[in-house]
């Protein structure tokens, strides 16, 4: 498993929008990252040995000062080392905005090969299971059709006077994930991007959290 910083870097290299972040290996770097990104920020422990960070207290939202960023960095390091996991650093990331949490996942099926899933995201993704499957390579039009099959699809057009959401950017990200899964040099076995924050038309989407497994 890649750590989250490496996962985000891999996605960004493929043209997939990710939240602005810095990987900090010292308290001083965490303070500098806070000043560079600007508060409030999210602080997350980073370890290739830990996939679900929130369950261990390795995610802190709304950090508002440089002093707090340094303090939380030290706390995250302590938690990771306490659990005997590899300490890869601490991520300082911008507090991304969006109107809907979306999930993009992918895996290698023994029969069909690479499969990409898109659907409603967030912490209840496994409860509501509102997803559609795509077999790469697929086009943006095919991704659009898949999103249109979701139960949440009416929300994309905007309801109760809300503007439409930027589904075009989401389709572009899905297509790029399909291309990534088809690239043997990348060696990606599976990935889970949740949430991908989808904003209003023209404002794009952004990957906030990523878990990627490679060969």
Please annotate each region the language model reported.
Residues 1-215:
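ATP-dependent carboxylate/acyl-activation modules
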């Amino acid at each position: 498993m890649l750590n989250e910083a490496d996962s985000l870097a891999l996605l960004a290299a493929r043209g997939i929008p990710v939240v602005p972040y810095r990987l900090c290996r010292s308290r001083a770097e965490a303070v500098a990252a806070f000043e560079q990104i600007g508060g409030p920020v999210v602080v997350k422990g980073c370890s290739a040995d830990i996939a679900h960070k929130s369950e261990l207290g390795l995610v802190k939202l709304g950090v508002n000062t440089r002093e707090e960023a340094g303090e939380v960095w030290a706390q995250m390091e302590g938690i990771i080392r306490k659990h005997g996991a590899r300490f890869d650093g601490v991520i300082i990331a911008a507090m991304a905005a969006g109107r809907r949490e979306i999930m993009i996942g992918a895996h290698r099926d023994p029969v069909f090969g690479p499969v990409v899933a898109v659907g409603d995201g967030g912490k209840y993704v496994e409860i509501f299971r509102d997803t559609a499957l795509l077999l790469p390579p697929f086009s943006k039009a095919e991704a659009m059709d898949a999103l249109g099959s979701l139960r949440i699809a009416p929300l994309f057009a905007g309801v109760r006077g809300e503007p439409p959401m930027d589904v075009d950017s989401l389709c572009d990200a899905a297509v790029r994930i399909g291309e990534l899964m088809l690239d043997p040099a990348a060696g990606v076995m599976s990935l889970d991007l949740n949430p991908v924050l989808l904003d209003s038309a023209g404002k794009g989407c952004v990957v906030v959290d990523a878990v990627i497994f490679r060969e």
